[in-house]
């Protein structure tokens, strides 16, 4: 996931739309630690309790034996507040997930980073585990320490199937993480056109803005002139909206080159003409 930094320098005071070193856009190419996909837990066998270890390696028989003895807590936590359910979900053991649920484990429990088993299943691309959790009442709107929901992780993982399933279970389409990114803004930042299309069809707010008041069209123009720009322009995009530095989408376009600037302004003029004709 790319990280966006504010414009540096002073804003130009004239009406020129040429490139200016006074308003460059800085874009880091590395992913921030707040949101990543595919990462399971880093575990050390010697630190694992018996129930946790059985869940981690998917040993159903041992898990049954431990649970039948009733001397092991199905909701027991390790040093990082992870339960056996967290570990089973991270490793994709649907049978273990079902067994733990049958034995009354807590489903919406959070680890040391506030990640629920559902968030962990989505983060690790374990759709079958996520499905079982949702069927048994997992809350898709709980957030981790960075305020990411399971839907944010599904978007980051480019998993439309999982995103759709989460929305079927009332996931909040407009939830914002600590960067102010809704799932749509995140999809645009990741330059994932298929996910952008999907979220727009589901009714995502095209004019939602991040903590710097940047809308989807602005973020698309920062990433690079992409097909997502054209897609967003087909929506009811507010081109007059200003970010915290006072820049509009048209100015973002001008920073990225003359051609893209005219693509935006031409679309804006067409919208104005359409509105005038309507009256």
From Swiss-Prot:
Q: Which Gene Ontology cellular component terms are annotated? A: nucleus
User: Which SMART domains does the protein's record reference?
Assistant: ANK
Annotated segments matching region Disordered:
1-25
Q: Which PANTHER family match?
A: ANKYRIN REPEAT DOMAIN 36-RELATED (PTHR24147), ANKYRIN REPEAT DOMAIN-CONTAINING PROTEIN 7 (PTHR24147:SF62)
Q: Which domain of life is it from?
A: Eukaryota
- Presence of the UniProt keyword Metal-binding in the record: no
Under the heading Pfam families, the entry gives: Ank, Ank_2
One annotated GO biological process: blastocyst hatching
The record's InterPro entries line, in alphabetical order, gives: Ankyrin_repeat_domain, Ankyrin_rpt, Ankyrin_rpt-contain_sf
Q: What are the protein's UniProt keywords?
A: ANK repeat, Repeat
The protein's matches in SUPFAM superfamilies, at most eight in alphabetical order, are given as: Ankyrin repeat
Q: Which cysteines are joined by disulfide bonds?
A: none
Q: Tell me the ranges holding the ANK repeats.
A: 80-109, 113-142, 146-175, 179-208, 212-241
This chain belongs to which protein, by name? Ankyrin repeat domain-containing protein 7
Provide ranges: composition bias, Basic residues: 1-11
């Amino acid at each position: 996931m790319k990280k966006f930094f504010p414009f540096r320098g002073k804003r130009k005071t004239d009406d020129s739309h040429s490139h200016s070193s006074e308003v460059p856009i800085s874009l880091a190419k590395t992913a921030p630690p707040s949101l990543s996909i595919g990462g399971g837990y880093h575990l050390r066998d010697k630190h694992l309790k018996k129930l946790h270890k059985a869940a981690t390696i998917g040993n159903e028989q041992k898990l049954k034996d431990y649970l039948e003895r009733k001397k092991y807590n199905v909701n027991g936590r390790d040093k990082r507040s992870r339960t056996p359910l967290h570990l089973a979900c991270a490793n994709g053991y649907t049978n273990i997930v079902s067994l733990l649920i049958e034995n009354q484990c807590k489903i919406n429990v959070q680890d040391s980073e506030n990640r629920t088993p559902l968030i962990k299943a989505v983060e690790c691309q374990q759709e079958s585990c996520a499905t079982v959790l949702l069927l048994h009442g997992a809350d898709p709107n709980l957030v981790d320490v960075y305020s990411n929901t399971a839907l944010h992780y599904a978007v980051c993982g480019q998993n439309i199937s999982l995103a759709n399933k989460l929305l079927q279970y009332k996931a909040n389409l407009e939830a914002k993480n600590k960067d102010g990114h809704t799932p749509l803004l995140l999809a645009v930042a990741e330059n994932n056109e298929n996910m952008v299309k999907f979220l727009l069809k589901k009714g995502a707010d095209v004019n939602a803005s991040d903590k710097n008041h940047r809308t989807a069209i602005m973020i698309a123009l920062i990433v690079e002139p992409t097909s997502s720009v054209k897609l967003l322009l087909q929506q009811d995009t507010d081109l007059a909206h200003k970010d915290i530095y006072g820049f509009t989408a048209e100015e973002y376009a001008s920073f990225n080159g003359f051609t893209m600037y005219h693509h935006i302004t031409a679309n804006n003029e067409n919208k104005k003409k359409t509105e005038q004709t309507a009256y």
